[in-house]
Structure formats: structure tokens, C-alpha cells
Amino acid sequence: MKFDAKPVIGVVADLNRRPTHPVHSVGDKYLDAVTAGVGALAFIIPALIDRPGAAFTDPADIGRVLDMLDGLFLTGATSNVHPSQYGADLSNPASPSDTARDHVSLSMVREAVQRGLPILGVCRGFQEINAALGGTLHQEVHNTPGLSDHREKDDDPLDVQYGPSHAVALAEGGLLRRLAGDATTQVNSLHGQGVDRLAPNLAVEAVAPDGLVEAYRGETGGFLLAVQWHPEWKFRENPLSVRIFEIFGEAARAWRARRGASSLAS
């Protein structure tokens, strides 16, 4: 194996129906951010569970996949993390879910954190990581007292949906504040769920005006950064988005270099 080559980033797929056939898919904008923003190869991980011989029902399968990776990217999605993943009941039966992705993503996150594998999460991925590590979520931010409506308007053009929506305050001494070179930044907002209780060993990196956590980093182990917004959307036009993917790439290349050194030593 050539360890000076591009790092390999795993991207967990959604399980959707298009129109009636089950399809494992990842949005093009996420793969573009991995290949062009991170400077890596994208490895799509299917959400395969609950069928005979399926991958990822055996914890060893998770490990074998992670053995091939230099980083893990958890993307956004139209579905929500099912509240059973953090010990709660479903408050709205109409809430879209993807329990196959829940199972694969959360299992991947837990094992990746144990290894110190670099992790980046956005939107749903931000919520998945928090749930995987012991945190909880607001199932409907817009119906939570004291919090604003953070959802997009479906009938708006995409450039409006993904356009700047509100400012976030960046934590003093935090990674994002250093990358942004400022105490605040404007972000888009396209989410119905949000962080309620932050998981242990995660530190707040950004907060919305209503107090909702919008970004966090891992305090122990390897590189872990997650944001509630969508930095992958036209990332080339946003200096902070560029830096988020660059620094994830730096962590992935460092991981790959260590893998190479370990392989040569053995």
C-alpha cells in the first residue's frame, strides 16, 4: 500500500427510495467537498443492516471498514436521527427517519473515536456524533420553548435555502475562531433537530443567538469537529468552509502517515 497517496475518507450513505427502489446514496456536494476540499478519495459506506449476511451487523465488520480509512465524514440528510438512539420516544410519527443509517453511522462513530480516527460531521452528522457519544437531541427545535425556527423554506431556491441565515458566536480559544479569525460568522440553517444535551468530552465551538449549540469539537483523542450548518455548499466561496475541509484533510493525511510508519515498522 502506498501511504504517501491521497487519504481515504469514508462517507456513510443514506438509505432512500427513488422512487420505490431502495437506494444507498450520498449527495454530490459532499463528495465534491471530500475530493476537492479535503483532497482525498471518497469511499461510500452503504447503510446495510437487517438482512441475511448484511455488513455492519457484526462489530468486526465496522473495524474492517475503518481499517481502510484515514477519516470519517458524516453528512447531512433529509432524515432525522431516531430518538431511540438516545433513549427517547418519538414525538412526531411523521418525522422522517433512516434507522439503517443511524445504526451504521453511530457504530462507525463510536469505533472511530476509540481509534482516534479523524471525524468531521455536518448537519445530521453533527447530530449523529452527539447521539453516538451519549448526548441527546431536540426532536423539533421550532417547538422547543426559547429556541428559534432553524428550518429552511422548501419553496425557496437552493441558493436562498443554503444562503446565510444567522450569525453564530465562535468560542474564545476555539478551533473555529482561530480558523475564522473573528468572533462571529454567518451560517446557513436547514435543520429541524438540534443538540439538547452535549455528549461528554465534547466542547462547544459555536452558539446561535438563541443559545442552540451550532458546533463542537472533541476534547480528547483524535481530530473531531462537527457543525450544524452546511459548509460543503459552494465551499470554495467561503473562506471558513475552505479551512474546515483543509484542516480535516491535514488530520487525515497525518493519520495516513502514521499508518504508513506503523506498517513499515511491523
Annotate each predicted stretch with a short phrase.
Residues 1-120, 131-138, 142-180, 184-186, ...:
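N-terminal beta1-alpha1 cap of cysteine-dependent amidohydrolase-like domains
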